[in-house]
Amino acid sequence: MELNCDVQRKRKISDLRPIASIDTQLRIYYEHAEIGTDEVRMLFGQNISNSTVSRLKKLARAKMADMEIQYIFSRFCVNTEAAYAAWGIDVNDLERRKKKLAALKLLDA
């Protein structure tokens, strides 16, 4: 049986990975206690749909509930620490990688 190559597999939200640089990911993490749609788009790309942003926030809200974290500023935002945990963004790993890049003199000044 031949598969139709024109049919695209619907991507799961768990397949989505951040496209932002290490510096951008760390800057967002340390600058914002809660993040909204703008920051989510900075992390995952400006072209992601509103429904994808909503699904990412839903994952983060579930993690907030697990971690028993309350909203600080707005119910339209999600806690940054919980969001990064829900999305599989490891801040310690990012910092380690940034130090390695600096040691190899591969970081832009």
Regions found by a protein language model. Give the residues of each.
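Polyanion-binding surface elements
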Residues: L26-T52
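A detector for short, charged/polar N-terminal pre-domain segments
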Residues: V7-A33
